[in-house]
Amino acid sequence: MFKSGFISIIGRPNVGKSTLTNEILGEKLSIVSCRPQTTRNNIRAVLTRDDYQLVFLDTPGIHKPRHKLGEYMVKAAETSTDEVDLIVFITTPEGEISKGDELILEGLKNSKKPVFLVINKIDENPQELVAKTLKQYSEYMDFAEIIPISARKSKNVDTLLELMIKYMPEGPKYYPEDMITDVQERFVVSEIIREKALKLLSEEVPHGIAVEIISMKQSKRGTYHIDANLLCEKDSHKGIIIGKGGQKLKTISTYARQDIEKFLDAKVNLKVWVKVKKEWRDSNFMLKELGYKE
């Protein structure tokens, strides 16, 4: 019997949704950063084995939006639960139920789909706090399964995966066996560049940045030549991103190129420029150009 289905992974920003997706797949598809709200699109990732296929939707964190990009991110996350077979709600040990989690759980209480509670980052918190969190959430609503994990250290992730498969219906292969994501290569490349920028830049810049792939061509010898714009909203941010003598931008580009080469399994020649696009997060035109809106 072949089982298949769709799984929505939801939660507040920075609870480890992307880390979990990447750990399950063994591939770096979703952007991972210590800063919240780094995932901006629903990333559809595919895990295929001999007897099952799981399709994961790694969603943006649900939060109170402050601009049009934020509105898009929240809408993308909320609509991801409409047509799935299983909802995986992720949180972290905090003892009390946060207002952000309460908002999400209220929307899940009447769901006809099974909902898993996954408590992530148990390796970073005292057992007493983990136990208190489990008690608080299990009393708040009924969950199909409750699994404490550490996505970063892969603790209990295999157990979670086994339970996911258990809840999947019998079904077809929705995607080819060798397919791991339905997003275009250009999108993954842009996300890799953005991830490196998020990790290397100061707090004041990151959420105002985006990456625009201008050109991506493969030569006859197999080398990819990629030109990209790293967009920011303020002139002052441009200098921070470039850094003294261009060193910061060079570091971002070097780290990004290394990961892009792993993803494409080919040599990469990457050129990145910094451009100022004021208030791009509130521009419908720019959001469409960058692929955040249809």
Swiss-Prot record:
Compartments where located = Cytoplasm; Cell membrane
The Gene Ontology terms for molecular function here are:
GTP binding; GTPase activity; ribosomal small subunit binding; small ribosomal subunit rRNA binding
* Entry-linked CDD domains: Era, KH-II_Era
Task: Enumerate the PROSITE patterns for this protein.
Answer: G_ERA (PS51713), KH_TYPE_2 (PS50823)
| Primary localization class, coarse | cytoplasm
SUPFAM superfamilies from the UniProt entry: P-loop containing nucleoside triphosphate hydrolases, Prokaryotic type KH domain (KH-domain type II)
Please name the InterPro entries in this protein's record: G_ERA_dom, GTP-bd, GTPase_Era-like, KH_dom-like_a/b, KH_dom_type_2, KH_sf_prok-type, P-loop_NTPase, Small_GTP-bd
Q: Where is this region: G5?
A: 149-151
| Subunit note | Monomer.
Describe the family membership recorded for this protein in Swiss-Prot or TrEMBL.
Belongs to the TRAFAC class TrmE-Era-EngA-EngB-Septin-like GTPase superfamily. Era GTPase family.
The record's annotation in NCBIfam families points to: era, PRK00089.1, small_GTP
The name under which this protein is listed is GTPase Era
Q: What is the organism of origin for this protein?
A: Clostridium novyi (strain NT)
